[in-house]
Amino acid sequence: MFIVEWSRTRVVFGAGTLERLGTELDTLGLARCLLVTTPRRDATIASVLAGLGDRLAGVCDIAAMHVPSDRVQRALAEVDRVRPDALLAAGGGSAIGLAKAIARERPLPIVAVPTTYAGSEMTSIWGITSGDTKTTGRNPAVAPRLVIYDPVLTLSLPAHTSAASGMNAMAHAVEAMYAPDASPMAAAVAEDAIRTLARALPSVAVTPRDLDARTLALRGAHAAAMALELAPMGLHHKLCHVLGGFGLPHAETHAALLPHVVAFNAPAAPEAMARIAGALGTNDAASGLRALNDILGLTMSLGTLGLKQADVERAASAVGAATFPNPRAATADAVRQLLVDAL
């Protein structure tokens, strides 16, 4: 048995599509948008502001990694002050994540203009961090109403960020391949995403200004995010969310952990692993992911990302006590060993 629930998100994909922002907003009847982004201002934000024109109600540029709860409260205060009719999130997962946290509390539609491959724009998944605990969940109300994918906006994304963000997307697709009770559609979309990203990301690493390669990578990220929305999250995402509470960088944590989690789950999901390996163009899924990390220059471990040996026990206990679908039982002891191997 499987159950599919899909959000009502309009997607506009293609080079130069940011120029359609005003038209798309008018079509949806949105006239006062609060721009949600990070403190960093660049050419992308300037282009978004130009596209908004007199539809700009205000700017909330306080988004930060893992969506800290204090930033959410500040953003809610800004919403109450400005009273927009929509949230326009421009940037990566931090900006879109903050918009989702706002939308949980205030019934506002989200327009997303992603500039990375993180994928939050296509899901109903939200996350908020308080102290060293990151809480996540699903809520249809936070799924963006409109997503504009313009590959031109990714041309200036630094090489390391592109690689790590791309492997973040890869993790979405890989975990959807073996998720218990996921629909056949999820696996089909995920397999296409893996194949597309495996082809695109090395090209982006070599020629980061190649618009064709960037377009392919963004298409793969879009498909990976769709797969994530169609499938339950398992051990990999649970681990990444728990480690996010310790302040580890989100995308890099995905990249460092993914081969280890895939190797752990492999005995319990041989058919899915064979399909993953085939999509990667290798004979073994975990080895193929390690090789791709190497090609992309992502050779870091959890230790180099900031995880301390003293934190391993706390993280293992938190994951081991949680309930989530996974092909193989993830006890605290098993998770502890996995984290030690990934240090």
Label every PLM stretch briefly.
Residues 66, 92-94, 102, 115-119, ...:
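Acidic, glycine-rich active-site loops and adjacent beta-strand->loop/helix elements
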Residues 79-102, 106-117, 239:
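A short, small-residue-rich loop immediately preceding and capping a beta-strand
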Residues 279-343:
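C-terminal charged capping/lid subdomain of soluble metabolic enzymes
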Residues 1-85, 302:
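ATP/NTP phosphate-donor binding region
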Residues 18-21, 41-45, 69-70, 94-101, ...:
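Short glycine/serine/threonine-rich phosphate/pyrophosphate-binding segments
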